[in-house]
């Protein structure tokens, strides 16, 4: 006869040996408590990401009944006519111009490739047409970058970054009309190349742990911020004409008075701004992008 504990089950009866009870109460609990001490706590950035947004397609996965219906009904993943024409013409021609061996050897793309990217508004794919951009969807942008990457990873990154991270999208969402009218047309045609100064030397791209900071001051009757920062691995920084600089704003003297608040912000700095120095070009993984 099995020496165990009789418990109710959903269908019939089950016998659970006492050894399993002991194992659960001792070893498993001890291992769990140990893991809690060893594993790092969720950072502020991770907590913000976990709490952001709403439940979408992922909810059906955790419910055990995943379905693509929600995604198909919500997103139209087909290319528009303009995007398809661009893929079959401009992107196809660009791929024919790219010689990855030479790009890697010379650590740069040829001048005619740079000129073609600007003339055909590759840097303005996400910028609305009213500002001179192409007004492509996220899917269109993704398809363009994917095809370019089949010929040159460095060229793909060069095109991808201005259309994803940094001043372009931030200006469209949060910029003043004056800022949009000035910057967006220039960004669309590559007259100004942007870069996004987020990654720090000590904190990486964890924005919540960023040590770069700026103190609100008044100088000559003008309200401003004196910022101190050190950034690293900023793609396109060597050729950028404008920098989207991320830092923590501190207002110890309460000078903002309702016109702003403490926390993470982005400042637009033109190349040559007093105090802004772009250092030596780094060599991440021997990539040829700037």
Which residue stretches match the model-derived regions?
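A short core secondary-structure module
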Residues: 222-276
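Short Pro/Gly-enriched beta-strand edge/turn motifs at strand-loop
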Residues: 192-198, 226-227, 275-278
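A gly/ser-rich beta-alpha-beta helix-loop segment of oxidoreductase catalytic cores
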Residues: 195-216
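Flexible, small-/acidic-enriched active-site or ligand-binding loops
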Residues: 274-290
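Amphipathic, small/basic residue-rich leader segments at the start of a protein or domain
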Residues: 4-162, 169-193, 205, 220-225
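Short, solvent-exposed loop/turn segments at the edges of secondary structure
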Residues: 162-166, 191, 207-209, 238-242, ...
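Short helix/loop capping segments that flank catalytic or ligand/cofactor-binding pockets
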Residues: 50, 134-136, 182, 205-207, ...
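Short, solvent-exposed loop/turn elements at beta->coil junctions and helix N-caps
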Residues: 199-202, 233, 281-284
């Amino acid at each position: 006869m099995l020496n165990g504990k009789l418990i109710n089950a959903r269908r019939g009866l089950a016998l659970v040996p006492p050894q399993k009870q002991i194992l659960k109460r001792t070893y498993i609990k001890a291992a769990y408590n140990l893991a809690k001490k060893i594993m790092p706590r969720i950072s502020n950035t991770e907590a913000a990401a976990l709490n952001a947004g709403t439940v979408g397609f992922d909810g059906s996965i955790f419910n055990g009944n995943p379905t693509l219906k929600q995604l198909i009904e919500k997103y139209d993943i087909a290319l528009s006519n303009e995007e398809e024409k661009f893929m079959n013409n401009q992107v196809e021609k660009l791929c024919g111009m790219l010689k990855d061996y030479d790009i890697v050897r010379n650590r740069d793309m040829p001048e005619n490739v740079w000129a073609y990217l600007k003339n055909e508004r590759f840097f303005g794919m996400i910028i609305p047409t009213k500002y001179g951009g192409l007004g492509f969807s996220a899917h269109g942008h993704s398809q363009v970058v994917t095809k370019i990457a089949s010929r040159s990873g460095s060229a793909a990154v060069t095109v991808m970054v201005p259309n994803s991270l940094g001043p372009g999208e931030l200006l469209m969402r949060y910029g003043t009309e004056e800022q949009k009218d000035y910057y967006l047309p220039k960004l669309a045609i590559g007259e100004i190349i942007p870069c996004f100064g987020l990654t720090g030397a000590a904190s990486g791209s964890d924005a919540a742990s960023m040590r770069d900071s700026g103190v609100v001051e008044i100088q000559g009757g003008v309200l401003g911020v004196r910022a101190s920062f050190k950034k690293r691995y900023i793609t396109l920084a060597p050729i950028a004409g404008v920098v989207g600089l991320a830092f923590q704003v501190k207002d110890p003297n309460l000078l903002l008075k309702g016109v702003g608040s403490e926390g993470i912000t982005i400042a637009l700095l033109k190349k040559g701004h007093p105090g802004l120095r772009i250092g030596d070009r780094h060599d991440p993984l021997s990539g040829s992008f700037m």
